[in-house]
C-alpha cells in the first residue's frame, strides 16, 4: 500500500515533474525498474548541448487510458499509472527524438535537393550572362587541377654580399666593365676598344682607353692567399653622398628607390632553371664629377659631332671645261652679237640720210656710195675677256674704219668741187 500511495501522490496534479520520476533515493538497489529512469535522465542532460538532437515538445492526447485521479480517490492505481503520465514521457524521450529527428532531416534534404534542381533548371532556361556560383567554380577547378611531381637535381648557389645589399645599375655609355680578369701579358688595348664599341642595347660607347673601364685582377698576398683587386672604388662621405674613383676619373654616385610594385630580382642562371638570389630595391646612377674631366669633354665633343651638319660634297665623275671660262666666252659672244647689231642699224640710218631726195640725181650708178657720213667715230671699247682672236678681229675693224674715213674725205672734196662748178655755170648764163 505504501508504494502505491507514493505513486498516486506523485501523480497528483500540481506536483513538480522531478517528484514524479522515481529517483534512486526512495528506491532500493535491488529493483532494476527504478534505476532505468536515472540513466535516461543522464542521456537527456548530455543531449542538451546539441541543438539538432533536442526532442520536440510532445502533446498529450486526452484518452481514457491516461485519466488522472485525485489524491483522495477510492480506486487504487496500478504501479505504472504515474509512469503513464510522466514516466513514459521521460523514458521514451530519446526514442521519440530519434524518430522525429530523422524524418525532419530527410525532409529538409529533400527540399534542398528540389530547390537546387529547380534553380539549375531555371539557370538552364536563362539566356545571356549567368553569374556562376564561386563555390561550384572552386570545386570544378580543384577537380581539374593535376599536380605532377618531378624530381630535379640542381646545384645550390649562395652568393656572399657585402654589408650593403646589391643595387640595380644601368651602365652609361661612358663607363664599361671588363668581365674577364686583367692579364698584362695577354692584354691588347686595340681589341678591347673594338669589343667596347657597342653595348648590350646597341649604343655606341665612348672608349677612353683605360680611364673609364672597370677592371679586376687576381693576385696573391704575403701569405699566398688569392685576393681580388680592382682599379675602382666607391667612397662614402660624411654627408651621405658617394663617389666612384676610377683611375684618374671621379664620378658622382646617386641612389634612387625603385617602384615597389615591380622590383627586379638578381638571378643565377643554371642549365634547367634560374634561381633568385636577391631583390633589388634601389637604382644606382653615375655622372662626371666636373666639366674639366676628360670624360665630360669626350661626351660633349661626341654630342657636338652628332649635332654638327657636315657640308655636302658632290662628286663629279665627268671632268670637262672650267665653268667659269665657258661663262666668260658666252658673255663675250653675246656682247659681240649686240655690237654687230648696233653697227648694222647705224649704217642703215646713215645711208638713208645720204640718199635724200635733193641729191638723188647727182650721183651715177657706177659711183661708190659712202658707207657712212659721219665725220668721226668713237673708238670701240675693248671686249671683256677677249682672246687673241678677238684682238685680231678688232685690228681688222679699225683698218676698215680708217678706209671708211678716207672715203668720206674724198666724198667731201668732190662735193665742194661740184658746188663750185654749178655756181660758175649759173653766172655765165646770166
UniProtKB/Swiss-Prot annotation:
This is RNA polymerase-associated protein LEO1. It comes from the Eukaryota. The gene is leo-1. Residues 326-347, 409-429 form a coiled coil. Component of the PAF1 complex which is a multifunctional complex involved in transcription initiation via genetic interactions with TATA-binding proteins, elongation and transcription-coupled histone modification. Residues 99-119 have a biased composition (Basic and acidic residues). Residues 1-128, 349-430 are annotated as: Disordered. One of its GO terms (cellular component) is cytoplasm. Keywords: Activator, Coiled coil, Cytoplasm, Nucleus, Transcription, Transcription regulation. Disulfide bonds: none annotated. Belongs to the LEO1 family. The keyword Transcription applies. One of its GO terms (biological process) is positive regulation of transcription elongation by RNA polymerase II. The keyword Nucleus applies. Residues 18-30 have a biased composition (Low complexity). It is found in: Nucleus; Cytoplasm. InterPro entries: Leo1 (IPR007149). Component of the PAF1 complex which consists of at least cdc-73, ctr-9, leo-1, pafo-1 and rtfo-1. It comes from Caenorhabditis elegans. Residues 1-10 have a biased composition (Polar residues).
Amino acid at each position: 500500500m505504501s508504494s502505491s500511495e507514493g505513486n498516486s501522490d506523485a501523480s497528483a496534479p500540481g506536483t513538480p515533474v522531478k517528484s514524479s520520476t522515481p529517483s534512486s533515493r526512495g528506491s532500493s538497489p535491488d529493483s532494476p525498474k527504478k534505476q532505468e529512469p536515472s540513466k535516461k535522465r543522464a542521456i537527456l542532460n548530455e543531449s542538451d548541448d546539441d541543438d539538432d538532437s533536442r526532442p520536440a515538445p510532445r502533446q498529450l492526447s486526452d484518452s481514457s487510458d491516461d485519466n488522472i485521479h485525485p489524491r483522495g480517490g477510492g480506486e487504487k492505481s496500478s504501479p505504472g499509472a504515474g509512469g503513464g503520465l510522466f514516466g513514459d514521457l521521460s523514458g521514451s524521450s530519446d526514442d521519440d527524438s530519434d524518430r522525429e529527428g530523422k524524418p525532419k532531416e530527410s525532409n529538409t534534404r529533400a527540399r534542398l535537393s528540389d530547390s537546387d534542381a529547380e534553380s539549375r533548371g531555371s539557370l538552364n532556361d536563362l539566356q545571356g550572362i549567368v553569374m556562376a556560383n564561386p563555390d561550384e567554380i572552386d570545386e570544378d577547378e580543384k577537380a581539374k587541377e593535376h599536380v605532377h611531381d618531378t624530381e630535379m637535381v640542381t646545384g645550390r648557389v649562395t652568393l656572399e654580399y657585402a654589408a650593403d645589399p646589391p643595387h640595380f645599375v644601368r651602365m652609361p655609355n661612358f663607363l664599361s666593365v671588363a668581365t674577364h680578369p686583367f692579364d698584362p701579358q695577354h692584354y691588347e688595348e686595340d681589341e678591347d676598344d673594338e669589343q667596347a664599341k657597342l653595348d648590350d642595347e646597341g649604343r655606341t660607347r665612348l672608349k677612353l682607353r683605360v680611364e673609364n673601364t672597370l677592371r679586376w685582377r687576381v693576385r696573391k698576398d704575403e701569405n699566398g692567399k688569392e685576393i681580388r683587386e680592382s682599379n675602382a672604388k666607391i667612397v662614402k662621405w660624411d654627408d651621405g653622398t658617394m663617389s666612384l674613383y676610377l683611375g684618374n676619373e671621379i664620378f658622382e654616385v646617386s641612389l634612387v628607390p625603385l617602384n615597389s610594385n615591380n622590383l627586379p630580382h638578381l638571378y643565377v642562371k643554371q642549365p634547367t632553371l634560374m634561381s633568385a638570389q636577391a631583390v633589388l630595391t634601389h637604382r644606382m646612377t653615375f655622372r662626371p664629377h666636373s666639366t674639366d674631366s676628360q670624360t665630360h669633354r669626350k661626351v660633349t665633343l661626341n654630342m657636338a659631332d652628332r649635332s654638327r651638319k657636315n657640308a655636302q660634297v658632290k662628286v663629279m665623275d665627268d671632268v670637262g671645261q672650267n665653268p667659269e671660262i665657258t661663262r666668260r666666252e658666252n658673255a663675250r659672244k653675246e656682247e659681240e652679237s649686240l655690237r654687230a647689231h648696233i653697227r648694222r642699224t647705224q649704217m642703215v640710218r646713215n645711208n638713208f640720210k645720204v640718199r635724200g631726195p635733193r641729191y638723188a640725181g647727182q650721183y651715177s650708178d657706177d659711183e661708190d656710195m659712202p658707207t657712212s657720213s659721219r665725220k668721226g667715230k668713237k673708238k670701240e671699247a675693248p671686249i671683256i675677256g677677249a682672246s687673241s682672236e678677238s684682238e685680231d678681229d678688232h685690228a681688222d675693224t679699225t683698218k676698215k674704219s680708217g678706209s671708211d674715213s678716207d672715203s668720206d674725205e674724198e666724198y667731201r672734196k668732190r662735193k665742194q668741187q661740184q658746188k663750185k662748178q654749178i655756181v660758175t655755170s649759173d653766172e655765165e648764163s646770166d
